[in-house]
Design a protein with these regions (language model features):
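Extended, helix-rich architectural segments
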Residues: 1-158, 514, 521-577
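Extended alpha-helical, oligomerization-prone segments that build pores/tubes and scaffolds
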Residues: 88-521, 529
């Protein structure tokens, strides 16, 4: 049952869920530290906490250097960008379904217009929705209504409400994601309350009193607001939602420290340190007012001579003999020669950083980055061509990433189903029956190049013909997913080519061993020529036999190509054969 206005004001004075809101805000801020790109120095709590940890890890002088190397945007922004780019393939599923049932065909047509032109679906979920998924996982989806209805039908809309704007809330007992009520502050500093019966808006006075501005009823029977994301960190904290990178936040902190500290190493370890015996300089000006002392000038009062910048002026003789270019030069005292034994040490030496240490730091940074991507996306994500990998590893990476995508897909489907159902009920009432949303059964996880590499690996490791057929089909569907005509043509060509997984050379060798017939070999070696002839004498292979069963169509084409291979001329084929 809905609240009275006095009860709503009491909620404002004594809000619920304060501790959970604070935890959710802190969690989102820590996520945003690694996901949101900033160009200005924003020392919020996650940044301060991170720098405090670094300060405890290293000595003070090293910490001061670390601070000078720490700038925004941080290095982990690039890692999370790569991660979420991989996960965004959830919106690139094959065979997506958006099925809406209405009692009236007019309402169904109106909804198709309304959701595409007004709500900007489905693209709004891959833009605004994905942005909230990355940075504000604890945001709340709110379906709202205009204050005044203008057209013939209500015009509900939805938005993502940041958890930082929520003042008080309570979830339903049976559904920990659906709100029983919610109270939040708008950007205009208005106080809004929504429950299962009404939309209420207040103006707030300087005395912190609430003045009623809007009080509109709705007949949904439930509060039109829910947590955007369904998956929680734990059963004990169902209102704190889990991001794909939540469990790796500490690892992101370590990678950021390591990559920043490596900048210090790069600053000096890339260049050698030269050393040589110190040189005795006897420079003195003609008037005797300037003389060299350890490479810098002093006056007749034995005081350092400074330039306009306040720094000691270098000796014109010594400075011209100093090291030019990258590196450092250190002077060492000339050794005393005892008993007239000369010092045979090389007067000029060069000290370089240990190559093994440098390579370790480079490789370790790369390993940490790859491990983060692998941990969050679930598996290899992309095929590594520089390392040996077998078929089982490829399958494991593919299946693990698919599992992650299916989990994310389910979360977006639940959120969009709630929004679309609620908007349809508010706009069409009893005319709306149901909706079914499915982002697709499979995803374009790999690029055509990566799939081709996987195909090569599976072929070399002895995969079955059925597995290779499925992967070849996936390569074609992925590469030509935006060109359905070419996709259909290549799928047909793949069907009619004999021994399609053999190269021309492999086919010839098997023919010599009497494994394949001469007829099949001729078709394989002359397939492009035979197909062009078939299309000249009949029609293109896509349109040919379009009224026939697909299996029958392929059978006719294959038999015709075999006739070509056997030397028959002017063979004409009718699709009705």
């Amino acid at each position: 049952m809905g609240k009275s206005l006095d009860e709503i004001r009491e909620i404002y004075r004594h809000p619920e869920g304060i501790s959970q809101i604070a935890k959710a805000k802190e969690h989102e801020e820590r996520i945003a530290f690694h996901t949101r790109v900033r160009t200005s120095d924003d020392r919020n709590k996650p940044v301060i906490d991170f720098l405090s940890k670094v300060k405890a890890w290293i000595a003070k002088d090293k910490y001061d250097i670390f601070l000078s190397m720490f700038h925004f945007p941080v290095k982990t922004n690039g890692v999370t960008s790569e991660i979420f780019d991989k996960l965004s393939r959830v919106f690139d599923g094959r065979n997506p379904v958006y099925n809406y049932q209405f009692k009236s065909s007019e309402d169904r047509d109106d909804w198709e217009y309304y959701r595409k032109d007004v709500l900007k679906e489905p693209s709004v979920w891959s833009t605004d929705g994905w942005d909230n998924f990355k940075h504000r996982i604890n945001s709340v989806l709110v379906v709202d209504m205009p204050e005044v209805q203008v057209g013939e039908k209500p015009e509900p809309y939805f938005f993502w409400l940041p958890i930082a704007n929520v003042l008080s809330y309570r979830t339903c007992g049976k559904d920990c994601n659906l709100m029983a009520y919610i109270m939040y502050v708008t950007d205009e500093n208005k106080i809004v309350y929504i429950d299962e019966e009404r939309y209420v808006r207040f103006d707030k006075t300087r005395e912190n009193d609430l003045i009623l501005e809007v009080d509109n009823m709705h007949d949904l029977g439930y509060c039109p607001a829910r947590f955007f994301w369904s998956d929680s960190i734990s059963l004990s904290e169902p209102d704190i939602k889990i991001s794909p990178i939540t469990s790796e936040l500490d690892s992101f902190d370590w990678y950021l420290y390591y990559s920043t500290a490596k900048k210090h190493l790069d600053l000096y370890a890339s260049y050698p340190i030269y050393s040589g015996y110190e040189r005795d300089c006897h420079y003195e000006s003609h008037d005797g007012k300037e003389r060299c002392d350890d490479g810098f000038l002093k006056n007749e009062k034995n005081e350092w001579i400074t330039g306009a910048d306040g720094k000691p002026m270098a000796c014109p003789i010594c400075s011209s003999k100093r090291l030019r270019g990258a590196g450092s030069y250190v002077e060492i005292p000339i050794p005393d020669e005892i008993h007239n034994v000369p010092d045979l040490k090389n007067p000029i030496t060069m000290l370089s950083a240990d190559t093994g240490s440098l390579e370790y730091n480079v490789n370790e940074e790369k390993r940490l980055r790859e491990e983060l991507v692998r941990s969050v996306t679930g598996g290899e994500g992309e095929l590594n061509r520089s390392e040996a990998i077998n078929e089982k590893q490829v399958k494991a990476g593919f299946e693990s990433l698919t599992t992650k995508l299916n989990r994310i897909k389910r979360g977006f489907e639940e959120a969009q189903t709630f929004v679309d159902s609620t908007i349809c009920l508010l706009r069409y009432g009893d005319s709306f029956v149901s909706c079914n949303i499915n982002y697709g059964t499979e995803f374009y996880i790999y690029t055509p190049e990566e799939l081709s590499e996987r195909y090569k690996i599976m072929k070399e490791t002895g995969a079955s013909e059925a597995e290779l057929d499925a992967l070849r089909q996936q390569i074609i569907e992925t590469e030509y997913r935006n060109d359905p005509t070419q996709m259909q043509r290549l799928l047909i060509l793949n069907e009619i080519e004999p021994y399609s997984h053999l190269t021309r050379e492999e086919a010839v060798n098997l023919y010599k061993e009497n494994v394949i017939s001469e007829e099949d070999l001729r078709v394989k070696l002359n397939l492009p020529t035979f197909v062009r002839r078939f299309e000249r004498e009949n029609m293109n292979i896509i349109e040919f036999g379009s009224a026939l069963d697909y299996k029958k169509k392929i059978e006719i084409i294959i038999n015709t190509l075999k006739k070509y291979a056997n030397g028959l001329q002017n063979v004409s084929v009718r699709p009705t054969e």
